[in-house]
């Protein structure tokens, strides 16, 4: 069998310790071909006749083309029946349940031929270590008799002593310490300034000085005007009018400043200009003018970005008010559509919105805080309306992006698991970005005289995204047919992401807890269903080993998932329980202690009091507003951390500044992260200030920029938590059942409609004579509040339980607790079914004993981690008592008392029975049960005594017995292989037929993207006029690779969920387009006419103003070159399979009149099923073409270089044929150069070395090829004789004698793999008639 051959060769290769990376990929194809074969060829039909033109088959003569046509149809038929990976194809239905320098490092050769040894400056003695200088030392005697040389050495020594002496050293030090040359004195500099100014004005110095004196004396009016400038109260000025007034005043001020040579002179002559108020007024007017101009520019940049991002075909003329964001909506939708195609939308927001705006937002807030009083005196307001529009823009945009993504997501019916994972990542990013925007903008406007106009539906849209995220999580974790035992880990991950969302988004504080609880409940139910299914329908096992393996897997999966779910449930319980219920023991004493502890009554306007319910607030809440009380009652902080924090990884963290950080020396610096995304960070103006500011930022949380990793906040977390905890208060809801007299302080809540929500009906929580403690803030503070309250009231109350004040959440918590109870009950009550089944099929005692041990551990886990009523506790304990008794019964009746394992199990079972019957539990047994317990314990005790090892005698005897024992196993295997294969083939064919009915095909949707009336885009219009121009909704995923002109990404078709490869070619100017247009057009022309399983599928092109997107088939397996990086392919059968697929694709190309001309491992890809695909047809040409266009590519397809003529060389030298390099007029048969390149690829697969790897450069390679030499063939250890003969036919120097791809398909080396794949049975021969 084929698989036996593959497995045997794989084992041999593994023993050799070499990499077989491609083996598993290609073996899929061989298995499919062998198992799906229905039409088979005889061995006689596949015999090769060398270079003859025909082969004989009975009376008819068959040409190579006829045989190729038949084989090709059979090959294509098998590939079309290929089963795909269900991760990409199976829909999930909603159910109810990544040059060394070879020069000489020691010797540096100079241009004049001399040499210098680098050890000259290394501190080692030069004349004793360098060979070159040792020779110089041998000539020293001759130099000593040379008078000229002696004179020069003396002069050299004298110069060295002078330059190294103290005098020269001192002068060097003095010169170095001079920071600058002596400057001109002040008087001389002023005279120069005056002389220059007089010369410029055509006056003498005396005249100029008199004029300046007069002008300085008359400048007081300008300074007084600045000091008295104020916009009249009630006068409304437009921004342009105010700008004209301020600009005129500032122009006159700057004109007056020019009367003095410098500001110091002006400050001395006019002291008023050196006052703080005057300086502040100048700064305010300058800042106002700067901010108006820059905010206008930022707005214009956003408009340009929106227009540039929209497609060429967009003809929307959106008329919007300049300062009005809602009027942006028509373009928001277009922009959102385009942003959906980008993978990382957060980086788009950072580069296009946050990065340009953040420094100006920061500076405006800083100036507002510093000059607030001056702004009030001058009655000047910053251009807040423009600021509001820029602040609100990303809010409106993210809302539109969410709505657009939701509309596409809801159109998908039964999405695949890959699509679900992609959508989960998308919505998680959208929610994270929305929360960051809401938090940052709200905080930014907290001390500004305006608020951001959030879209009224923004928060509802975010909540819809949250709901849909949980819908997707349900599909992934619950509705998938596969059991996901890592679901609790995934839930914990998204809990960490979403738990603080409700603190910022109104309405999410109840949605998120309820959705997490529903998911957890469904997971527990699914786990119980899985357990029942395994108990009621266990598989049939051939031997005890299979049964033990299956049972161990069940116990491991159940136990691990139960433990993880328990831990996650406990996290939810602790996060959601915000109240403690007490019973009142002494009503009057309780009221007195509350008054003594400075509690105050919160009067609700008789809303609660009329029902006998009274609210008291802790002294920490004294002076709070109404919203604080309502947030406690409505549990707005449910699930949040004690100090909610957001990890903002973009420049939203630069927007805000605290009121204490008013140092104008603070600067904003630029930088880039590892991905090339630009960012700003806040720094100080000097190194000393930087150190100080870095220290302060930890305390004030000023710069939380993640790029500043040196700002570590861990040392401040404990202190911050302590401060937050001590500042939190609590509400006490008293339901005494009788009137309460209160003579302490009272706080009255205004209005009577504050408690309209049903969740506020606190009277339903407890019964009369009950007290409820509601904590403020995070529910993690509840334990602290309980301890604090207990110290206050003492024994006047008794603690009952913790719970959640929201009825819906408390109900879900109780349902989860009940589900755990049912699951544990199922395990403890139904273990007998599994025990009985295994006793019949596999009566191995060790396997059966593990069932009891699993039940014991499961019950213990429930009692340890779950809270429940005493009744349910009694039921579980009683079942565990019965489990212990049955365990003892099993050991007594079924196990071998002489087996050492039985002794070990008895110890465990008796210990468990003792624990479960301890205390009053023993009384739960009736007389019969107690009697049975005593008898079984008695037998087990006897067994224990019989196994006691006295003085080591038993151990010695056992050791001797083990040395004498021998294991004799006689295994007989009698399997009908033919019947097994027949059943296997039938089942596979049925599965393929079912899959074919449900497989989705990607229709080529036609559409126009370009504006046909635009005359300035002739190249784009030419591309857009192609029949392959498509219009589809797609989204960019991960980056694959890039080159000179283009980058390749994986993408997802949002309309049907298919994975695509998108080549994105940026168009910077007309010159660039003129250069790459022929390349794009040529490759499109070739790809449009090809359709074959071994050629990458081309889907179409999408044309925009600034880029062109080419859609192709996505090959997830990577390139053949990347596989060969791990080493050669050890298994020759794998090489044969790959070569077979390469020949099939190459024969199709040549039959279609296309020559690839750049075949190499980098241009050969593998899809996720391991099928070979030819890519990169930039150098390809058709037979009817009048000219040839070429392009040199890397591992990823890339449009790169300019068009070359027909006579120029194309391809990669090490894979180029001799006739291509020499430019010979004799080209041989069609595609002969491709066959040579294919032989070089097969050679590289067999040896793991590039062809001509022993040569240094491409010129040497081309010389050897043109000289008639061929690459070194594999040795006998690397390839069989048939394989080497195949290579010799490919690497023939004369192109006219070189075999074609069709001829190579019936080479004996290919016949071998074809027979293995398709078979050679005589009864299934298919006659072929000559054409």
Swiss-Prot record:
Note: Present with 56 molecules/cell in log phase SD medium.
Family matches, as SUPFAM superfamilies: Protein kinase-like (PK-like)
Designated name of the protein: Serine/threonine-protein kinase SSK22
Gene source species: Saccharomyces cerevisiae (strain ATCC 204508 / S288c)
One of the GO BP terms on file: p38MAPK cascade
Name of the encoding gene: SSK22
GO cellular component: cytoplasm
Purpose: Kinase involved in a signal transduction pathway that is activated by changes in the osmolarity of the extracellular environment. Activates the PBS2 MAP kinase kinase by phosphorylation.
Domain (Protein kinase) ranges: 1034-1310
Active site residues according to the UniProt entry: 1158
EC number: 2.7.11.1
Transmembrane segments: none
């Amino acid at each position: 069998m084929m698989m036996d051959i593959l497995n045997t060769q794989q084992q041999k290769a593994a023993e050799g310790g070499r990499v077989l990376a491609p083996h598993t990929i290609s073996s899929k194809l061989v298995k499919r071909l062998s198992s799906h074969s229905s039409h088979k060829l005889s061995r006689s039909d596949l015999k090769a006749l060398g270079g003859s033109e025909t082969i004989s088959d009975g009376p008819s003569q068959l040409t190579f083309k006829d045989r190729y046509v038949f084989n090709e149809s059979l090959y294509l038929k098998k590939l079309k029946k290929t089963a795909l990976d269900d991760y990409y194809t199976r829909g999930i239905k909603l159910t109810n349940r990544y040059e060394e320098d070879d020069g000489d490092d020691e010797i540096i050769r100079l241009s004049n031929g001399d040499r210098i040894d680098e050890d000259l400056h290394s501190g080692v003695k030069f004349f004793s270590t360098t060979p070159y200088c040792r020779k110089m030392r041998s000539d020293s005697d001759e130099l000593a008799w040379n008078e000229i040389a002696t004179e020069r050495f003396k002069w050299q020594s004298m110069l060295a002593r002078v330059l190294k002496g103290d005098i020269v050293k001192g002068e060097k030090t003095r010169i170095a310490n001079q920071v600058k040359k002596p400057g001109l004195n002040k008087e001389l500099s002023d005279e120069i300034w005056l002389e220059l100014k007089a010369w410029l004005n055509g006056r003498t110095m005396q005249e100029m000085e008199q004029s300046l004196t007069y002008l300085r004396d008359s400048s007081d009016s300008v300074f007084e005007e600045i000091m008295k400038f104020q916009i009249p109260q009630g006068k409304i000025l437009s921004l342009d009018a105010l700008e004209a007034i301020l600009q005129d005043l500032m122009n006159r001020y700057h004109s007056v400043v020019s009367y003095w040579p410098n500001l110091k002179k002006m400050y001395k002559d006019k002291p008023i200009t050196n006052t703080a108020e005057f300086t502040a007024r100048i700064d305010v007017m300058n800042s106002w003018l700067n901010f108006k101009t820059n905010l206008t520019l930022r707005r214009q940049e956003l408009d340009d970005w929106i227009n540039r991002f929209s497609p060429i075909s967009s003809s929307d003329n959106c008329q919007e008010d300049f300062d009005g964001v809602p009027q942006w909506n028509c373009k928001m939708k277009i922009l959102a559509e385009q942003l959906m195609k980008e993978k990382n939308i957060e980086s788009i927001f950072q580069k296009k919105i946050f990065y340009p705006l953040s420094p100006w937002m920061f500076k405006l807030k800083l100036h507002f805080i510093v000059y607030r009083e001056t702004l009030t005196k001058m009655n000047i307001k910053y251009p807040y309306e423009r600021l509001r529009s820029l602040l609100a823009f990303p809010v409106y945009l993210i809302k539109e992006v969410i709505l657009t993504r939701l509309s596409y997501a809801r159109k998908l019916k039964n999405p695949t698991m890959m699509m679900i994972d992609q959508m989960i990542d998308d919505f998680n990013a959208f929610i994270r970005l929305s929360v960051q925007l809401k938090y940052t903008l709200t905080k930014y406007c907290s001390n500004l005289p305006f608020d951001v106009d959030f879209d009224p539906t923004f928060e509802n849209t975010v909540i819809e995204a949250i709901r849909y995220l949980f819908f997707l999580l349900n599909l992934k974790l619950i509705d998938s047919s596969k059991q996901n035992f890592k679901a609790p880990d995934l839930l914990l991950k998204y809990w960490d992401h979403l738990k603080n969302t409700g603190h910022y988004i109104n309405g999410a504080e109840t949605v998120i807890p309820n959705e997490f609880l529903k998911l957890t409940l469904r997971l527990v139910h699914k786990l119980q269903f899985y357990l029942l299914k395994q108990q009621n329908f266990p598989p049939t096992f051939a031997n005890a080993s299979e049964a033990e393996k299956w049972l161990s897997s069940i116990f491991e999966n159940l136990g691990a998932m139960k433990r993880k779910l328990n831990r996650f449930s406990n996290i939810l319980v602790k996060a959601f329980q915000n109240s403690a219920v007490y019973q009142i023991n002494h009503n009057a004493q309780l009221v007195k202690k509350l008054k003594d502890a400075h509690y105050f009554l919160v009067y609700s306007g008789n809303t609660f009091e009329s029902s006998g319910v009274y609210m008291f607030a802790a002294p920490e809440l004294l002076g709070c507003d109404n919203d604080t009380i309502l947030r406690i009652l409505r549990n707005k902080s449910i699930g949040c951390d004690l100090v909610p924090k957001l990890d903002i990884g973009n420049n939203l963290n630069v927007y805000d500044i605290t009121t204490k950080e008013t140092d104008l020396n603070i600067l904003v610096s630029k930088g880039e992260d590892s991905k090339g995304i630009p960012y700003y960070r806040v720094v100080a103006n000097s190194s000393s200030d930087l150190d100080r500011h870095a220290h302060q930022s930890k305390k004030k949380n000023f710069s939380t920029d993640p790029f500043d990793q040196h700002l570590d906040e861990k040392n401040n977390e404990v202190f911050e938590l302590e401060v937050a905890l001590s500042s939190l208060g609590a509400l006490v809801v008293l339901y005494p059942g009788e009137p309460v007299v209160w003579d302490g302080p009272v706080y009255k809540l205004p209005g009577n409609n504050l408690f309209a929500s049903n969740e506020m009906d606190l009277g339903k929580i407890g019964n009369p004579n009950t007290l409820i403690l509601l904590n403020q803030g995070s529910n993690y503070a509840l334990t602290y509040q309980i301890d604090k309250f207990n110290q206050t009231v003492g024994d006047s109350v008794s603690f009952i339980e913790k719970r959640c004040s929201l009825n819906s959440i408390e109900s879900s918590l109780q349902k989860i607790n009940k589900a755990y109870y049912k699951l544990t009950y199922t395990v403890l009550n139904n273990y007998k079914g599994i025990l009985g089944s295994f006793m019949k099929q596999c009566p191995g005692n060790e396997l059966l004993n593990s069932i009891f041990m699993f039940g014991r551990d499961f019950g213990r886990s429930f009692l340890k981690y779950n809270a429940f009523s005493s009744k349910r506790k009694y039921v579980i304990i009683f079942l565990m008592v019965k489990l212990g008794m049955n365990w003892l019964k099993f050991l007594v009746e079924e196990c071998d008392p002489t087996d050492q394992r039985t002794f070990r199990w008895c110890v465990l079972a008796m210990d468990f029975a003792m624990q479960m019957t301890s205390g009053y539990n023993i009384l739960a047994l009736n007389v019969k049960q107690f009697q049975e317990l005593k008898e079984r314990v008695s037998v087990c005790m006897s067994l224990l005594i019989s196994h006691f090892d006295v003085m080591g005698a038993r151990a010695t005897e056992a050791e001797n017995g083990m040395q004498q024992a021998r294991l004799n196993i006689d295994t007989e295997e009698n399997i009908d292989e033919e019947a097994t294969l027949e059943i296997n083939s039938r089942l596979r064919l049925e599965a393929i037929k079912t899959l074919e009915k449900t497989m989705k095909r990607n229709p080529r949707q036609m559409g126009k993207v370009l504006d046909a009336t635009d005359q300035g885009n002739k190249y784009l219009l030419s591309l857009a006029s192609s029949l392959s121009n498509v219009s589809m909704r797609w989204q960019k995923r991960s980056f694959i690779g890039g080159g000179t002109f283009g980058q390749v990404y994986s993408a997802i078709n949002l309309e049907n969920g298919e994975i695509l490869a998108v080549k994105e070619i940026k168009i910077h100017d007309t010159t660039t387009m003129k250069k790459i247009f022929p390349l794009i057009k040529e490759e499109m022309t070739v790809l449009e006419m090809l359709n074959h399983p071994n050629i990458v599928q081309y889907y179409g092109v999408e044309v925009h103003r600034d880029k062109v997107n080419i859609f192709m088939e996505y090959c997830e397996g990577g390139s053949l070159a990347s596989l060969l990086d791990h080493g050669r392919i050890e298994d020759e059968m794998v090489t044969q399979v790959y070569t077979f697929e390469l020949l099939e694709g190459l024969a199709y190309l040549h039959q279609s009149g296309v020559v690839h001309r750049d075949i190499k491992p980098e241009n050969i890809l593998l899809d996720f099923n391991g099928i070979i695909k030819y890519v990169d047809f930039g150098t390809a040409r058709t037979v009817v073409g009048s000219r040839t266009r070429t392009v040199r590519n890397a591992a990823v397809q890339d449009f790169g270089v300019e068009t070359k003529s027909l006579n120029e060389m194309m391809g990669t030298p090490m894979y180029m044929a001799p006739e291509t390099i020499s430019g010979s007029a004799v080209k041989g048969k069609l595609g002969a150069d491709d066959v040579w390149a294919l032989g070089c690829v097969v050679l590289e697969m067999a040896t793991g070395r590039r062809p001509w790897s022993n040569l240094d450069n491409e010129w040497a390679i081309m010389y050897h090829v043109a000289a008639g030499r061929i690459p070194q063939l594999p040795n006998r250890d690397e390839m069989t004789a048939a394989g080497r003969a195949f290579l010799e036919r490919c690497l023939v120097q004369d192109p006219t004698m070189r075999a074609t791809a069709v001829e190579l398909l019936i080479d004996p080396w290919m016949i071998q793999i074809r027979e293995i794949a398709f078979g050679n049975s005589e009864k299934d021969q298919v006659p072929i008639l000559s054409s």
